[in-house]
């Protein structure tokens, strides 16, 4: 918990909680609303894809912005912008056409593609070099709480009050997050180096070269491809799994998605304290393996029981390895990328995540009626397992350099 002693990091940590809570509210509510309105898994998949594509298209700009501009200001403006572009959802809530949701999701995703690289590139600047993994663990904690609060609130508000209630709550949460970021962070070191006259495309390509040169970043790229395909499949299949296989409600969708935060909380505390000195590759590999095996158990268990209580417990547990793997991946990228290119490297990672998540969702939406839910769910679990085995194999071979976490300049 030591990074929270830094006031700037503590404020970023709280602001990130409100931002992620708002994001989870829409991530739960909008796909469920589309599925209930259209009754089509393919249409639901399309809505998910349209919410991911902008992150891929804006990757070159997002990374350069994160490296060149004041990262705190970028985060503040993005929060305010997300609140503004969500306003058309009030029109949908009052009977407007569903296709408006697609535009809103695309705009939200475009803004989020600016938020993630800036936030994650800012974290190493606000904590001591040796506390980076602990800081990422703390970010995982508030991410888990945000998932629980936002997922539960999104499903509950949609079920009891409709989409309008979700939107009003979403706007309120984002306003709080933006306000927390409005005041500058206290600079505790020199600002990051910048090259303001370098063309955007050339700067982005420079970040791509960084990934090609560094073995740890290449390994992270393999993980991103496999796990993002799995995540895209999950986004489509989860709604079908809960509503059709478990015969649940929209509230159950939010509950089961949000309850993963319980395991995530425990894992986040572990990463922030006792596991903060564990190698990122070990967290990524063993966490991913546990995630794949637990996912396979969950997807196949309805053959024996469809008890909601059982699945609440299992989804709570599966959140833990997800946080371990996520913290390991983020720390691996942060420590492998040079400080002056970290924003571009992170934006490329997030763009790859969005792109392959979209591909996974599209393929799943098209194959669902052909292969069936059960087969695709097991493929999804298998992708996580294969990804973890690749990481553990490369790590055991000794091919990963174990460089110390670099000291980086800090800026607000």
Descriptions of predicted regions:
Residues 1-412:
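Alpha-helical transmembrane-bundle signature of multi-pass membrane transport and export proteins
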